[in-house]
Design a protein with these regions (language model features):
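Conserved alpha/beta enzyme-core scaffold
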Residues: 1-501
């Protein structure tokens, strides 16, 4: 049979004020693209006519400008989870306009199944192809796995965007598998990075499908900034640390799978590892595969890669599709509850590497908020990996804003990963190995190896004035560097004596 075809505007007109919408995708890749471009226009028109119009948006991870950015600018988002990297969304959230839950990405599907977000009125998913059965639709996903099997099963209605920008052979990259809910859950049978345990397609109750929007729209993912001397040095520091750990016997000689977060720093780490002849051929078990991974897969430095999203440039995506016979044997796209599963991460011994906004001298880490209050992005999947990884590494530049902000501080203004979950901190200055060390030894390691030289005397001074205890802190001066930045615009102007009067 053939399902009803709709224009994007017709599809947007079927969405109601206060609807909760679940979306495919994970990062900008794999998200529906046509319907939301019309929905944001509709929201503006509704508001201009004096009528309310807002929706809740539930996804696997971040999405795109045409979803989060334009909808936030149209004041059309009532609730959002679990993650965002969009500037417009961030601005409106920090103005208090959007109710945003920053949540571990690996938890999203099961929280939906447990009903924590209420009913899903509509699921909108992107496919490269589909089999239009009378009772069951087999939907072949594009460049991301996300939370699709869960949202199409739970949603009252399903809208499909068939995007012919993607090759129909994208199906050969997917391993679609939904975890059973407690108390009927069984072990996830992934024993190796490349294991396939599910199907190439998501199954949808055909009676729920209200229509199909056909389009040909490229992905919105962009290339990251080119590496500079600072990010390159951080990458080399991570690579040197891992090689040293392998020589010490802490890492097996065959190496272990790597997870790396998203962004320029993560690419720098992968570049350094890929180029270093002392690092064996390795595998990647992560949530997002970027261009660097594809490059080193082609060169034979990366054997297998598993992810929830192929977040690469459109040129690289085309390369993957054009060489699908190779990549279908070495690259797997999973649901985020499998890519980010604590069970699988621990079983495989994944080495976790993610980016921090700031770390304090005792090893606590902040991924999400500036000076405690202002949302930057969110935790994403970092904690899924860092809490369960074989080794948990955070990287950050030692300073930002031309040296006015130190990423190493006495106390984090917001904590996402605690000192109990952080094994290693890396900046361009060096590496602090926190394993097997108490608070004071950790503090000295971080100050001397990771802090910028401009800030080391200040941080040493803080240790002297902090009240004695297992983990010395001064409640009056712990956030003095942040307070000074807010008042004077430069943490280097901090005078602890002003806070001890």
């Amino acid at each position: 049979m053939s399902y009803t075809r709709l224009s994007a505007a017709e599809a947007a007109a079927m969405i109601n004020d206060q609807d909760t919408i679940g979306l495919s995708g994970f990062t900008p890749n794999g998200v529906p693209k046509a319907t939301f471009r019309e929905l944001s226009k509709r929201a503006v028109a509704e508001h201009e006519a004096g009528r309310p119009f807002q929706v809740g948006i539930l996804t696997g991870a971040s999405t795109s400008q045409s979803i989060e950015g334009d909808m936030a600018a149209a004041h059309a988002i009532k609730f959002r989870a679990p993650f965002s990297t969009n500037r417009d969304f961030r601005n409106h959230t920090n103005l208090g306009e959007i109710d945003y839950e920053d949540m571990h990405l690996g938890h999203m599907a099961e929280r939906l199944r447990r009903g924590f977000y209420g009913d899903i009125d509509l699921a909108i998913i992107e496919v490269s192809d589909m089999e239009e059965g009378e009772n069951i639709c087999k939907a072949f996903l594009t460049s991301a796995g996300g939370i699709v099997p869960t949202i199409v099963r739970l949603a009252k209605k399903v809208l499909i965007e068939k995007n012919t920008f993607h090759s129909s052979e994208s199906r050969f990259l997917h391993d679609v598998y939904e975890i059973a809910e407690c108390p009927f859950r069984t072990p996830i049978p992934i024993m190796n990075v490349g294991d396939r345990i599910g199907k190439e397609y998501a199954e949808i109750d055909a009676h729920k499908i209200i229509g199909v929007v056909e389009c040909c729209i490229p992905e919105e993912a962009r290339a990251f900034k080119p590496l500079d001397s600072v990010t390159e040095q951080m990458g080399h520091n991570v690579a040197d640390f891992l090689i040293s750990d392998m020589k010490k016997g802490h890492i097996p000689p065959q190496f272990l799978p790597l997870q790396s977060g998203v962004g320029t720093t993560s690419n720098a780490v992968l570049e350094a590892l890929g180029q270093n002849p002392n690092v064996p051929v390795f595998s990647v078990y992560t949530e997002v595969v970027q261009d660097a991974v594809v490059k080193y897969m082609r060169e034979g430095r990366i054997k297998d890669a598993s992810c929830s999203s192929l977040t690469v440039t459109n040129d690289t995506l085309k390369e993957v599709y054009d060489d699908i016979d190779y990549f279908k044997k070495h690259l797997t796209i999973r649901q985020s509850e499998n890519s980010n599963s604590p069970e699988v991460i621990r079983r495989l011994g994944v080495i976790a590497m993610n980016t921090a906004i700031e770390c304090d001298i005792y090893g606590n880490e902040n991924s999400s908020h500036i000076c405690g209050s202002k949302l930057m992005n969110g935790i994403g999947g970092s904690c899924d990996y860092e809490r369960n990884g074989y080794i948990s590494i955070f990287t950050t530049q030692s300073t930002t804003k031309n040296g006015c902000i130190s990423a190493i501080v006495p106390m984090c203004s917001h904590v996402d990963s605690t000192e109990h979950d952080v094994d290693v901190i890396v900046t361009e200055q060096g590496v602090a190995d926190l394993r097997g060390k108490g608070p004071l030894r950790r503090a000295k390691e971080i100050i001397e190896n990771c802090a910028h030289p401009d800030y080391r005397p200040m941080l040493r001074e803080y240790l002297k004035i902090a009240e004695k205890g297992h983990e010395p802190q001064s409640m009056r001066a712990a956030l003095a560097m942040h307070d000074t930045f807010l008042k004077k615009g430069d943490m280097r102007l901090t005078d602890f004596s002003e806070y001890l009067k």
